[in-house]
Amino acid sequence: MTDASINASMTREEEASLGDYFALLKPRVMSLVVFTAFVGLMAAPIGVHPVIGFCAILFIAIGGGASGALNMWWDADIDQVMKRTKGRPIPAGKVDKGEALSLGLALSGLSVIMLALATNVFAGAFLAFTIFFYVVIYTMWLKRATPQNIVIGGAAGAFPPVIGWIAATGSMSVEPWLMFALTFLWTPPHFWALALFMRNDYDMADVPMLTVTHGRRSTRKHILVYTVILAAFALTTAFTSVGGPIYLTTAVVLNALFLKGAVQIWRRDEEICESDNFKIERSFFKLSLLYLFLHFGAILAEALLKPYGLGGW
């Protein structure tokens, strides 16, 4: 598909609705940002006034949405090619690229300034860095440059609990980085599982995902290796200041299931995968979402129960 045909097909066909502009913010991704940032905020040792806490999470969410809009602006050409993304507002002809850029920039500035005013300058600055990392380092550079794109770029999605912690404390410590590392190590097996059954999409869009550059067999090995590392870290985290019996129980069960799934994926025959439409890979991808949500849910439970002597060790 030529650039001219891509631009022509992205010409606005009708007036955009509020829902179309909201879709630019990647609400599903934003929900993960909101939840992990909230856990980081609540796990902090310094209590935050509910109004300030609400404002902090709101502005972090807006910053995450701004990143999504800028990502869609830059990736409009490949979104048009991929089946998974061609229904997004820009390739669907509902929102102009210029509008997405303007919205993303405006929300970026708003979120950073308001978070700094509502909490502290350190939190605002870290949010600004996160937006920059996701948009410039990952979207504009790494995504189309290397099969390690989501390994390095995954840091952007792992920063929200750190921002939440800083918003509450105004300082840095080891605890938020444990939450960062949990998300950072989770990102590769999560996205590589998606890439296993969406390989053709990435290939057509000329995105060098590991499945495209190294093949599915190599990707399966990488998923297994990263899952083993993730499981070891997740279980070790249970014995740190953010862990406790609730987290340990959750981690044991979830990592047993996740490791089992990774081994199943590693052993899979490609012909069988094609015949059952990557059933196991799709299930593993869905499990990965539950995996991260429940780990952070357990960290949140430990933090909420700790003042009553029921959380932590």
From Swiss-Prot:
Q: Which UniProt keywords apply?
A: Cell inner membrane, Cell membrane, Heme biosynthesis, Membrane, Transferase, Transmembrane, Transmembrane helix
Q: Where in the cell is it found?
A: Cell inner membrane
**GO MF:** protoheme IX farnesyltransferase activity
Per the record, the GO terms for biological process are: heme O biosynthetic process
Return the EC number.
2.5.1.141
Lineage: superkingdom: Bacteria
Stored InterPro entries: Protohaem_IX_farnesylTrfase, UbiA_prenyltransferase, UbiA_prenylTrfase_CS, UbiA_sf
Assembly, in brief, is:
Interacts with CtaA.
Output the PANTHER family linked to this UniProt entry.
4-HYDROXYBENZOATE SOLANESYLTRANSFERASE (PTHR43448:SF7), PROTOHEME IX FARNESYLTRANSFERASE, MITOCHONDRIAL (PTHR43448)
Its recorded name reads: Protoheme IX farnesyltransferase
Source organism (scientific name): Ruegeria sp. (strain TM1040)
